Amino acid sequence: MARPFPIQRTSIVREAGKKWFVVDASGKVLGRLASQIAKYLMGKNEPTFFPGVDNGNYVVVINADKVLLTGKKLDKKMYYHYSGYPGGLKQLTARQLLEKHPERLIYLAVKRMLPKAALGTKYLKRLKVYASDSHPHEAQKPQPLEF
C-alpha cells in the first residue's frame, strides 16, 4: 500500500570549524561595533547559520581604549553592579569605566546584544578584548575585519 504523503526528511546543520577574526576598535562607535561583533560571534555572517546550532566564530578586539561614544554618553551613561550587600550598589560613568577597564566597556556592550540563554554564554566565551594593540592569539592567524 502506497503512502499518501511522502516522508519528510530534515537536514541537520553541522558545526563547522571556527574562524578567528581580529577587529581594531580605534575610532569606532561603541554600539555599531558591538552589533557587528555580536553578529560574527553568533555566526550570522555564515551561509550555514541556524539559530539552534553554534556556528559562531572567535573575535579578538584590540585597541579597546580608543573606542568612541557619541553625544554626552561618556558622562551621562551609567554602569551599575551590585555586591549583594545593603548599600552595595556601585555605579561608574562610561568615562570612568573606559579609564579603569576599557575592555569591559566593549565586553558589556556585546554581552547585552547576545541571546540571554545557554548559547549566548558560549558565544561570549569566544570574545577576546584587549586594551592595547597586541594580543596573545597570533598563533590562530586571525583575519582582520573592517566595519
Swiss-Prot record:
InterPro entries: Ribosomal_uL13 (IPR005822), Ribosomal_uL13_bac-type (IPR005823), Ribosomal_uL13_sf (IPR036899). GO terms for biological process: negative regulation of translation; translation. GO terms for cellular component: cytosolic large ribosomal subunit. It comes from the Bacteria. GO terms for molecular function: mRNA binding; structural constituent of ribosome. The keyword Disulfide bond does not apply. Keywords: Ribonucleoprotein, Ribosomal protein. Gene3D superfamilies: Ribosomal protein L13. The keyword Ribosomal protein applies. This protein is one of the early assembly proteins of the 50S ribosomal subunit, although it is not seen to bind rRNA by itself. It is important during the early stages of 50S assembly. PANTHER family: LARGE RIBOSOMAL SUBUNIT PROTEIN UL13M (PTHR11545:SF2), RIBOSOMAL PROTEIN L13 (PTHR11545). Part of the 50S ribosomal subunit. Belongs to the universal ribosomal protein uL13 family. This is Large ribosomal subunit protein uL13.
